[in-house]
């Protein structure tokens, strides 16, 4: 993919732009991201402590994870191509007094050309299933992290169980997400993501599943990667 061609689906941008003002409403369509945030934040910080690190959050949206990582002591840059979401993230950081955080409207591929090997940690959470070319995003993340640095991904598996739970259940039965949030064909199997990571010269060190309890509204790590899963990678030392 050329650097002049944005790896973005206009329909996806429009979808999130329409909801931008609700990013920080804990009872909105983004409630699942707020509920999942403590789990993914703890997982990231446990493997690659955030204190004093330079971190990039790819597809940051309204800044839910980026803000939390900054509060853990990281210097955070959040990037996204949804202008309205970025404005919400910037306003929240200003109102909350979040330290050491900035937001930019730039593609991950363009930033990789501009600032390769610039970050200790790169996160790309719940984003790959929304772009036309996820492998391009993985390649760019690998270029942006320093040798020895960590890259974290999370996405949704592609199988019948994931379709029933993450799409039919979450969007149509429970109403946890707006209908049409996810497209089955864009979901990514762990083996496919691992292949993309290895092609980008990232070592896959850990893959964990995430399970949701609708009664307690809490997520927990598990060994079951059949629906939501996380993948931790490292770039080899130079």
Swiss-Prot record:
It is an enzyme of class 2 (transferase). It catalyses: a 3-demethylubiquinol + S-adenosyl-L-methionine = a ubiquinol + S-adenosyl-L-homocysteine + H(+); a 3-(all-trans-polyprenyl)benzene-1,2-diol + S-adenosyl-L-methionine = a 2-methoxy-6-(all-trans-polyprenyl)phenol + S-adenosyl-L-homocysteine + H(+). Its EC number is 2.1.1.222, 2.1.1.64. One of its GO terms (biological process) is methylation. Pathway: Cofactor biosynthesis; ubiquinone biosynthesis. It holds the Pfam family Methyltransf_23. S-adenosyl-L-methionine binds at residues 40, 59, 80, 125. The keyword S-adenosyl-L-methionine applies. InterPro entries: SAM-dependent_MTases_sf, UbiG_MeTrfase. GO terms for molecular function: 2-polyprenyl-6-hydroxyphenol methylase activity; 3-demethylubiquinol 3-O-methyltransferase activity; polyprenyldihydroxybenzoate methyltransferase activity. Coiled coil: none annotated. CDD domains: AdoMet_MTases. The keyword Transferase applies. Keywords: Methyltransferase, S-adenosyl-L-methionine, Transferase, Ubiquinone biosynthesis. O-methyltransferase that catalyzes the 2 O-methylation steps in the ubiquinone biosynthetic pathway. NCBIfam families: UbiG. PANTHER family: METHYLTRANSFERASE, UBIQUINONE BIOSYNTHESIS O-METHYLTRANSFERASE, MITOCHONDRIAL. Belongs to the methyltransferase superfamily. UbiG/COQ3 family. This is Ubiquinone biosynthesis O-methyltransferase.
């Amino acid at each position: 993919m050329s650097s002049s061609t944005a790896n973005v689906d206009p329909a996806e941008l429009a979808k999130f732009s329409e909801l931008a003002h609700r990013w920080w409403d804990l009872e909105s369509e983004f409630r699942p991201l707020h509920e999942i945030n403590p789990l993914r934040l703890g997982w990231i910080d446990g493997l690659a402590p955030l204190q004093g690190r330079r971190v990039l959050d790819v597809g940051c949206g309204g800044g839910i994870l980026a803000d939390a990582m900054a509060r853990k002591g990281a210097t955070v840059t959040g990037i996204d191509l949804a202008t309205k979401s970025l404005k919400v993230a910037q306003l929240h950081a200003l109102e909350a007094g979040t330290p050491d955080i900035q937001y930019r409207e730039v593609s991950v591929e363009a930033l990789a050309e501009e600032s390769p090997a610039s970050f200790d940690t790169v996160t790309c959470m719940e984003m790959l299933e929304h772009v036309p070319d996820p492998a391009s995003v993985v390649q760019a993340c690998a270029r942006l992290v320093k040798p020895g640095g960590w890259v974290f991904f999370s996405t949704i598996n592609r199988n019948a169980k994931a379709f029933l739970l993450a799409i039919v259940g979450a969007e149509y039965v429970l109403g946890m997400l707006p209908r049409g949030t996810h497209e089955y064909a864009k979901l990514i199997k762990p083996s496919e993501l691992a292949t993309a990571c290895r092609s980008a010269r990232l070592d896959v060190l850990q893959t964990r599943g995430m399970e949701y309890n609708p009664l307690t509204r809490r997520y927990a790590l598990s060994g079951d990667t059949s629906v939501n899963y996380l993948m931790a990678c490292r770039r080899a030392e130079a």
